[in-house]
Amino acid sequence: MSSIDYVQGTDSLKVSCRMEFEDFLKDLQTIDDDRNLRRSFNQQPFPSDLINQYFNSKVFIYINGKLLIGKLLSADLDGNDINLNLIYRLNKKPKSITVRNLILTGWYTDQTNLMIIRIDNFEKGIKLNPEHNEETYTIK
């Protein structure tokens, strides 16, 4: 489950993602199978460069047609889940948003990625999967 929230007055989006930690490690291996990932994630703080690389290769957010790059704010374990919070800087107020989510789509054919997008008065819940992994919306 992920959420994308426009933060008023800061020209940024805050993106939160919660997923099972074991699935996260498995999916992370698709971009970095050279490291002992379990050892890397047994230590705090988590390796932010690796999480940034992972998230930016799996979740693509375009505002007004421009691809944004996320930067990790925090990563926390909560039981069997990992919570990731990232920030995306904008240069203009959003008029359109395109989201592509590829998290776990290479592993599970029935994977569904739920996302909530909140920008000003616009709020939309979406389901993305391996065959339908992208949505575009105009913000009014």
Give the label of every model feature segment.
Residues 1-140:
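N-terminal soluble domains immediately following signal/targeting peptides that reside
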